[in-house]
């Protein structure tokens, strides 16, 4: 009888052990999913990782864009393909085909100004895996958290690369095109339909300015895409409609406070890039005002 009790007890223990192991393995993919690249907290300002999309300074070299981002109070920078590297090397550009030496020079300049590169785009991602891999290798080399694209047709390749490289992808929106009804990226409902059943590291690069140019309210769009915001090109525009232009935050119609509140409510941990597409030759004062607005708003909220 004692032997029978011991056998029964052993079977119970083994079942419990096996259940525990099964539970651990079931949770493993979720743990891996949550392991996507995190921007170090030291680069946070006012509760957000705020900086510039280098395209803001596309009249200048990357080195100058880095300097101007730091001068404006930014802590992070988002790269775009094709920008000249420096005044000393005007024939050298930064993109995913650049040489290792060029990439190292860019990394050194970014580190010199105590910034961190977080994103790259807007750039096309090919369906061909070998070609797509060049982009993800570049992102890994530069230590980026994400790539920004509009290549919806390459979604299967993108998802495979995201899983392999643990690098996020944000689908960007440009304004609604009256002469091209096939363009649907402006519509957050369409974008949600593209990403909702895909890896959680695939989502939206929320360009709030282009939503305003499409006569959409950014806060409403963010709510539609709740939980799938990878990054944001944050803008405040002077009016709703396709001809609108950038204004310093708080002086336009985009409801920047509402946008920040919604991003905070969603637990957003991506980068906010100022992509200021106005006053191109002398935008640093305006950009600094935008960054100061975000920093001050977050500090007042104790985020």
Where on the chain are the PLM-derived regions?
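Solvent-exposed loop/turn segments at secondary-structure junctions
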Residues: 55-59, 83-86, 122-127, 153-155, ...
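Bacterial N-terminal signal peptides that target proteins for export
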Residues: 7-21
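Bacterial N-terminal signal peptides
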Residues: 22-31
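Glycine-rich, proline-tolerant flexible connector loops at the mouths of alpha/beta enzymes
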Residues: 79-105
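Active-site acidic/histidine proton-transfer and metal-coordination neighborhood
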Residues: 29, 36-37, 103-104, 109-206, ...
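Conserved beta-strand positions in the central sheet of alpha/beta enzyme cores
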Residues: 78, 119, 148, 170, ...
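Histidine-acidic metal/acid-base catalytic patches
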Residues: 15, 35-54, 58-76, 191-206, ...
């Amino acid at each position: 009888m004692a032997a029978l009790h011991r056998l029964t007890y052993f079977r119970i223990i083994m079942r419990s052990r096996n259940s525990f192991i099964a539970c651990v393995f079931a949770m493993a993919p979720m743990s891996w999913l949550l392991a996507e690249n995190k921007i170090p907290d030291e680069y946070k300002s006012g509760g957000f990782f705020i900086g510039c999309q280098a395209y803001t300074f596309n009249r200048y070299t990357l080195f100058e864009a880095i300097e101007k981002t730091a001068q404006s109070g930014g802590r992070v920078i988002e790269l775009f393909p094709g920008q000249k590297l420096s005044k000393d090397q005007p024939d050298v550009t930064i993109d995913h085909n650049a040489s290792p030496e060029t990439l190292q020079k860019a990394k050194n300049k970014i580190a010199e100004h105590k910034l961190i590169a977080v994103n790259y785009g807007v750039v096309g991602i090919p369906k061909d895996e070998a070609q797509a891999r060049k982009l993800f290798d570049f992102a890994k080399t530069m230590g980026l958290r994400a790539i920004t694209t509009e290549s919806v047709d390459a979604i299967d390749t993108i998802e495979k690369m995201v899983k392999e490289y643990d690098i996020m992808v944000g689908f960007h929106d440009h304004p609604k095109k009256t002469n091209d009804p096939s363009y649907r990226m402006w519509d957050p409902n369409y974008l949600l339909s593209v990403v909702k059943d895909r890896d959680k590291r695939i989502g939206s690069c929320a360009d709030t300015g282009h939503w305003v140019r499409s006569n959409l309210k950014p806060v409403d769009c963010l709510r539609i895409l709740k939980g799938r915001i990878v990054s944001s090109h944050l803008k405040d525009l002077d009016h709703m409609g396709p001809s609108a232009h950038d204004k310093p935050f708080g002086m336009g119609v985009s409801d920047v406070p509402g946008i920040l509140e919604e991003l905070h409510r969603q637990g957003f941990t991506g980068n906010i890039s100022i992509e200021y597409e106005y006053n191109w030759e002398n935008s640093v004062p305006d950009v600094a005002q935008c960054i100061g607005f975000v920093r001050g708003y977050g500090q007042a909220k104790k985020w």
